Amino acid sequence: MKWVTRARPKVDRVACPWLIKRFVDPQAEFLYVPPDQVMDVANREGAIPFDVPDVELGHHGAKCSFDAIIKKYNLADRPLQRLALIVRGADTAAKDLTFESAGLEAIAEGFRLVYRDDHELLEREFPVYDALYAYCSF
């Protein structure tokens, strides 16, 4: 399945692909495009849009796209619920939601500065989410 979102990912646009690959669609292909092209590419490619305004898998109220994916795909795994709080705090204005959120935001911004290619950024940053998931499993 193809999934599409805005280019130059930050917290949610890396956390969501990690979540999708690990728990929803192991063969997922991610397309990163300019913001004004997301819906056109979604329609043309039959891709699922995420982390863009006015889509099912986007921000709703105080919750981020990571939360929307967990809800849609009924991912009730307790460590994922804990990780969702960390991601939400790092990706939204609720920076004090968890102690870990500010650190995740800083790490994610560092990855954006080091890696200019969006797909390489995903590949390099996924182990951070694997480690956070393990941490949340304790």
Where are these regions (language model features)?
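Conserved, aromatic- and glycine-enriched, well-ordered alpha/beta core segments
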Residues: 2-6, 13-74, 78-80
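Active-site-proximal structural scaffolding
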Residues: 12-13, 122
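A charged, amphipathic interaction segment
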Residues: 71-138
